[in-house]
């Protein structure tokens, strides 16, 4: 890419090039990512200034010939003109992506008449040209683009809409007459019309800023803001690729900085007790970077805050991370990037914190209130000591700001790799949404009206890549709310549709609310209650500070991932007491040790083989899905819609984390839309079935398959539970649908206990190197397998040496009950039958498979049943 000075010089040389004497030489500034709102803003601003203008209508047909664009253009009512357009050079400004623009130097050369074919691209243009000076004209164009069969089908209709309006078009009435919407593209271009030898790079920058100021009156401040972010990034990032993203505006301050993660129980389980971590309070402020650069001191937060100058010799750079209170101009530092020219980003937090207080003192020299956040190093795992530590931080009354949570900082990692978690009471967890009023006359059952309320839809932002990987679809009415140009960008709005509540994007706004006219605004909201088909949302405030971001077309409230992970704290509330005692419901807390590697791989292989039998099915239900251990297998199998049901909220929260992890780190050929339902499967089948059928988009006829891996033993306490399970499967499956159970086989377990003469309260063990690897404790006295209710204790690979109680599965009784409820047995097989296939799959793992592993695996099997 050339420099701007070089491009201007090349432009001037073109006029002395004899080979170009019959060519049209154009120097244009083209603005990118123009949506309807931006277009309308600039258009109305120019009309209001009563700048001389003209309107033209044209039809350009573009045909690709040997990688060149050959064009036929008809500027109505004149004749066709044939030419080819050849780009020579371009220069792209380093602006925020939503305000980005580039300078283009190109030539148009006449060519012979050519014949159009079906590959032609047709562009109908309604252009208003504002001659803002003798040197520059601004062209604002509404474009309709047609290709292939669209040309013959729609050309006449769009010519009428764009050109043949009832009244003669002027700059003042054009927008009203053609009423542009999502059918169109929008272009803003500035063309130089002065003497070539008079043009300078400074002239280009000046006119560019003039138009950008029309788009955003704060543009020059935004430019300074972006330059400040570049300065910070230059001291944090070493990758030229990442720095380029900052310079191009694709990344802003939020993407640059390590983010504080909303902590769920699943997160906390992984490092509880948090010995070695640092704890401080969460101030109710905004994230900000305090910078001392030369003689200037400023804070980069939601905007650029200039806080003064030393008036003395330039200082070495100091860069601090913290929370900023804009109204009071107060800064509370919690990390340091650079202190007096010394870069600290590769040091652990325990080292950086020593320099933080010194950096704060440098800020204080600028006569602003700056403090270091109070940190406590957690040194004890005792819950009582932890409680006192957390209380001393969260319940402290002497802080100069309101406290709305707790921050936990991991030691030992670099600045960018430091894990920082925030805990907030459920009430203080809020989300930012772009709110749009629901279009009328959609006739969507889920959009049922409520008297005294107006229905609005809640949107967040999402990348095109994540949208595809999560297999999301736009909600009904979406195309009426957002133009096609916005939907074709890399980042666009999507309805807030978390896995556990797909209709969470519905908001019924009270007619009596003090917040009026909320359509098109960004609102901070909290969940008050989850109703059957919608969420009872409360408006906290209108984010007036985000309205300008919204106009740029690159911001739509929270990012989808951030929003759903924050939402998890409504789904699985995390109490203050659990910070000290540890999260409740820690069934999945233990990790498998290395001795289970081969056996675990064998079980995984078998489950993978079973799930592949249902590959590419439309709707699959997993009963007892847990934290999503099989999620990757479903994704590999190309399941289109997966419904996971479990009563463990913490496990389901972990599953949702895995959903995003798979979407960002693993490649799958097919995308899967994931839904979760927090539900005890022992409850009545009718109630559970109704909840599943209420899932947005779930087919009336039912799912294609139901899978339950190593779960149904929980439902073998009584014959009533087994009956309920069979009824549930029948209600949820389509005719011909399949049930796939993997389970410990009660018959085989009883046989093992008899063979080893294990009596009541005695334990069968399988040891390796004097270590108990597998164990079953007999908790029943009967010598014969009962239909239900016989309990055993099982030592699980992830149970940290503790026995977990479960019921024996009488497979004969299970099959009998299912047959009674309209199912047929398709297949029943022991896991041991897969061992030869596993040997072929991985000879290295098979070699370390022990006899104990094989014995344990032989206790399991799978059952396949079909709904008649």
UniProtKB/Swiss-Prot annotation:
Keywords: Early protein, GTP-binding, Hydrolase, Methyltransferase, mRNA capping, mRNA processing, Nucleotide-binding, Nucleotidyltransferase, RNA-binding, S-adenosyl-L-methionine, Transferase, Virion. Its EC number is 3.6.1.74, 2.7.7.50, 2.1.1.56. One of its GO terms (molecular function) is mRNA 5'-cap (guanine-N7-)-methyltransferase activity. S-adenosyl-L-methionine binds at residues 607, 624, 646, 710-712. The N-terminus contains the mRNA 5'-triphosphatase domain, the central part contains the mRNA guanylyltransferase, and C-terminus contains the methyltransferase domain. It catalyses: a 5'-end triphospho-ribonucleoside in mRNA + H2O = a 5'-end diphospho-ribonucleoside in mRNA + phosphate + H(+); a 5'-end diphospho-ribonucleoside in mRNA + GTP + H(+) = a 5'-end (5'-triphosphoguanosine)-ribonucleoside in mRNA + diphosphate; a 5'-end (5'-triphosphoguanosine)-ribonucleoside in mRNA + S-adenosyl-L-methionine = a 5'-end (N(7)-methyl 5'-triphosphoguanosine)-ribonucleoside in mRNA + S-adenosyl-L-homocysteine. It comes from African swine fever virus (isolate Pig/Kenya/KEN-50/1950) (ASFV). This is mRNA-capping enzyme.
